[in-house]
Every structure is written in C-alpha cells, then in structure tokens.
From Swiss-Prot:
Changing E188Q: Arrests growth, inhibits tripeptide but not dipeptide formation, stably binds 70S ribosomes, probably locked in an ATP-bound form as it should not have ATPase activity, 47-fold decrease in translation. ATP 1 binds at G39, L40, N41, G42, A43, G44, K45, S46. The keyword Coiled coil does not apply. Monomer at concentrations found in vivo, exists in a slowly reversible monomer-homodimer equilibrium. Probably contacts ribosomal proteins L1, L5, L33 and S7, the 16S and 23S rRNA and the P-site containing tRNA(fMet). Belongs to the ABC transporter superfamily. ABCF family. Translational throttle EttA subfamily. Pfam families: ABC_tran, ABC_tran_Xtn. It catalyses: ATP + H2O = ADP + phosphate + H(+). It comes from Escherichia coli (strain K12). Its EC number is 3.6.1.-. This is Energy-dependent translational throttle protein EttA.
Length: 555
C-alpha cells in the first residue's frame, strides 16, 4: 500500500463574505491512522470532511485520495431512500453478498433440470461461493443482527420515512460500517448513540484496519481511539500526535506561552487536566467530595469568587434538606411500559446522570417531575424549597430573526436573574457571547452557539434544581468543559440526560440507568463506577448494547 492514503496540499476554503474558514492546510494521512478532529463550532470541521469526501470541490489547493482508495462518509444528516425498510437500507451495504446468496439458491434449483449445462452451473457456483466465502456470507444474518443490536436500530421492517433523525443516522452509520471502506470520514458519529453503543463503536473503530477521520466531542472516544488529534484553529490545521489526554497536556503548554489573552481558557483546561491526572480512584472520589462541599458551594463568598467562569449557571434559592423523592413510580405509553416501580431520593448537592437507549422514557421522567405529565401510579415529591429550571433538547423555538442579545433579554437593559437583577449584556456575556457576538442573528449561529443561547434563555429563572435534557448536544469541547466546570460549582442539584461518558464521569454523583422492560436502576457513583459495578455483578455481557425491549401491559 502507498505510504499515504490521502494528501492535502495548501487547501483553503473561502465562504461569504470572503472569510477563510480553512487556509493553507497541507496534510498527509497514513494507512490505518485514527484521527480525531477538534475545533470550536464554526471552525470548518464539517467543511474539511466534505472536501475530503469529494463533495465540496470549490476549494483552493488540492485534496485527493490515492487511486483505488474507497472512501466512506457519514454526514450529519445522511440521505436514505425513504421508501426502503431498515433491512433494505442495511442490505445495500452488502448487496454483492446478498445477490450472491440469492443467485446461489437459483443455481442449486437449476441442478434439478436434466437438460441444464452442469459444467456452466458448476463454474458459476464456484464463483458465487468464492464471493460468499470471502465475506463470511453464510453468517450474514448473524453479522447484520449483531450490528443492528450494537447500534440499537429500529425494527427491520420499519420504513425509513417514519424514522426520527437520530434513528436514520444510526441506520446510515450501520450501513457505512458494513461497507468496510478503506477510509472512514465520520461527522459526529456518536450523536444519537447511547453510552453503550458509543463504547461498541469505539471498539469497532479501534480494531478497524482502515483510516478513520472523525469529528467528535466525545472525549473518551478521542482518548481510546485516536492516535492523532487534528485541531482546526483560526483556519489552520494543527496536527498533534497522541490521544485527547496527551493533546490536553500539549495544549496546556501551548496556552502557557500565550498566557495573557488565553487566561480564562487555560484556567478551564487546567481544571479538566487536573481531573485527568488523578487517575480512576481520584476521579471517583470527586462526586463524594462535591456532596461534602455543598455548604461551601452555597456561600455568597464562593459564588462571587466564581463570577469569572466561562459559563455561568445562576444560583437559585438555598436548598433545604429534602430535594426529590420518587416512590413506586409507574408510567406507560399505549401498551409499552416505560417505568416499572421506580423509587429513589436525591440528596442535596447531587448531580444525577441519566442514561439509557433513545425512546426508553428519560425525557418522560423530566416531564413528570415538572408536572407536565402524570404517572400511572406512584408519587413524585419535591422539597418545599425546590425551584425547577428545565432545559430541553429542542432548540427550534428560538426566533432566527432576532439577535442573540434580543433573544435572551427581550430588549431589556436590566434582567431579573433568579432573585437578583443584572445588566442583560453582562448576563449574555457569561455564556461566552462577547461584544459583537451579541449582535449576531440567531439564524446565523452554529449548533453549539444555539446550544449556549438555549442555556442562557432557560437558566435565567435561577433554579436550584436543574433538569437538563441532552445539554451536551452540538457543543464544542471548549463549551463542554465550561459547562462541566459550571455544574461542578453550581450550588444546587441537577439531573442530566446525557450519553457523553467523559461528561458523566466528571459531573455525576449518581447514575439513573434505563434498562429493558421498564426497569430503571439508581446507583451512587459516576458512569465508570457504574460500568464496573454492572460488570462485577452481571458479567461483561451486560455492557454489550442490545435493542431495547418494552414490557407489554397485560390487557
């Protein structure tokens, strides 16, 4: 094989109005290299992949794969035939084997004809069996079922037209992996995957013999799969050899040289780096330490010391001893039982990470806690001092014609944030919208910027109990880190639905895990501790993803 599978020479990309989002990038990609692409939202990461996939040809410089290199590309919004079933879409990836198996059955049937040309049939049979043998075709159904379980695909006979965006992405990813290209270009492959499916994908790509270039904000994924980090910074492509943790070390050293203008970002990075360096045991004690520090977090002096953090979660009223108690909760939709006899209580200072497959009922729990829906039976009791602040995962309700400042402030110079008042521009600035950025139209924002704006809008009520539904979606790593630090310093409680394992390990004091047939488990500890507990009590197979099973309600 050639020394490089893909080369880029002085590649640049200009977007209106004459802005260079990529400039003068020269890179060569080794066979089998695993590269994670990092950069702020809007840095040009998706553009880079579209160029490499040959979709965006309006560029400066040259970008080309070596001859005969087969490239597979997963965009953020993949296109599938809406008339196909899930099974038909997946079988497109292995059509050569599917067709060979069908034709082989026909050849066997033709042997029954006494006038058949047996020599010709035998030759065709041999050719077909070679194809099937080369791809382990006789085990094709087993391969497809295993992949469908791992990525929690919908039922085989489900129509693509009826699937959600997340379900379509999982089908497209499954199909792409089964195609086995020489080079995989993956734009946010972990989006819409739960933690167990991400872990499976991680192992798959680690063992994949081809080259992988992946845009992802999943830092365990970057730690466990990537051998290189490509950082896009102000149009330039900066390669770093090593995984995410080693990149963090190098980045810290680099920012030390740019200390004055990078002071806030460096402070945030150093907090995460301190956590990385502690190792597993030190990390696991963090959750307990947070609970023990709850009184300090509540103090006015402590809150004032943290007013310079990059992202700000306004504190609510002081929490009393009772926060949330759930007793014998049961909830169903139609004939599907989502929650069966769930009981738990949350102590002061807890941050509960909620995990489980999509569609298992995680958001439904939030709607019951906030009173938007009622349980079938059981009780949810909030403490008298609890004030809820909810952030849902839907960010389409914002007015695209308004500026960032107008969307949050409603045009007011002074805003009420919880029980206090503050200048609206100062509040918006606490979500990293500085200066001219506050004048940007909402419709011009990247996914990550919309995420920050969404947080700024919904957190201004100043709650002491946060319900955060997929707050990490579309956030770049800088903002993820800032959100983690803000949650760790928040003087209240939070329940957070997330599939980001690094995020859950840094912030969670407890885990609520949605499993099969309405079972939900409550565990004290972070995500890694919970995985170790499951492996210890249920065996390694318990960590393998499977398509979710709903318990049927007896009629």
């Amino acid at each position: 094989m050639a020394q490089f599978v893909y080369t880029m020479h002085r590649v640049g990309k200009v977007v209106p109005p004459k802005r260079h989002i990529l400039k003068n990038i020269s890179l060569s990609f080794f066979p089998g290299a695993k590269i994670g692409v990092l950069g702020l939202n809007g840095a040009g990461k998706s553009t880079l992949l579209r160029i490499m996939a040959g979709i965006d040809k309006d560029i400066e410089g040259e970008a080309r794969p070596q001859p005969d290199i087969k490239i597979g590309y997963l965009p953020q919004e993949p296109q599938l035939n809406p008339e196909h079933t899930v099974r038909e879409s997946i079988e497109e990836a292995v059509s050569e084997v599917v067709n060979a198996l069908k034709r082989l059955d026909e050849v066997y049937a033709l042997y029954a004809d006494p006038d058949a040309d047996f020599d010709k049939l035998a030759a065709e049979q041999g050719r077909l069996e070679e194809i099937i043998q080369a791809h382990d075709g006789h085990n094709l159904n087993v391969q497809l079922e295993r992949a469908a379980d791992a990525l929690r695909l919908p039922d085989w006979d489900a129509k693509i037209a009826n699937l959600s965006g997340g379900e379509r992405r999982r089908v497209a990813l499954c199909r792409l992996l089964l195609e086995k290209p020489d080079m995989l270009l993956l734009d946010e492959p972990t989006n819409h995957l739960d933690a167990e499916s991400v872990a499976w994908l991680e192992r798959f790509l680690h063992d994949f013999e081809g080259t992988v270039v992946a845009i992802t904000h999943d830092r365990y994924f970057l730690d466990n799969v990537a051998g290189w980090i490509l950082e896009l910074d102000r149009g330039e492509g900066i390669p770093w050899e090593g995984n995410y943790s080693s990149w963090l070390e190098q980045k810290d050293q680099r920012l030390a040289q740019e200390a004055s203008q990078e002071a806030a970002r460096r402070k945030s990075i150093e907090k995460e780096l301190e956590w990385v360096r502690q190792g597993t045991k030190g990390r696991q004690s963090k959750g307990k330490a947070r609970l023990a520090r709850f009184e300090e977090l509540n103090s006015t002096e402590y809150q004032k010391r943290n007013e310079t953090n990059e992202l700000f979660i306004p504190p609510g009223p002081r929490l009393g001893d009772k926060v949330l108690e759930v007793s014998n909760l049961r909830k169903s939709y139609g004939d599907r039982l989502l929650i069966d006899d769930l009981s738990f209580s949350i102590p002061k200072g807890a941050i509960v990470g909620i995990i489980g497959p999509n569609g298992a009922g995680k958001s439904t729990l939030f709607r019951m806690i906030s009173g938007q829906e009622q349980p079938d039976s059981g009780t949810i009791t909030l403490g008298e001092t609890v004030k809820l602040a909810s952030v849902d995962q839907f960010r389409d309700s914002m007015d695209n014609s308004k500026t960032v400042w107008e969307e949050v402030s409603g045009g007011l110079d002074i805003m009420k944030i919880g029980n206090t008042e503050m200048p609206s521009r100062a509040y918006v600035g606490r979500f990293n919208f500085k200066g001219v950025d506050q004048g940007k139209r909402v419709g011009e924002l990247s996914g990550g910027e919309r995420g920050r704006l969404h947080l700024a809008k919904l957190l201004q009520v100043g709650g002491n109990m946060l319900l955060l539904d997929e707050p990490t979606n579309d956030l770049d790593i800088e903002t993820l880190r800032a959100l983690e630090n803000a949650l760790l310093e928040f003087p209240g409680c939070a329940m957070v639905i997330s599939h980001d394992r690094w995020f859950l390990d840094r912030i969670a004091t407890h885990i609520l895990d949605y499993q099969d047939e309405g079972k939900v488990e409550f565990f004290e500890g972070n995500f890694t501790e919970y995985e170790e507990y499951k492996k210890r009590t249920l065996g390694a197979d318990a960590l393998e993803p499977k398509r979710i099973k709903y318990k049927r309600i007896a009629k």
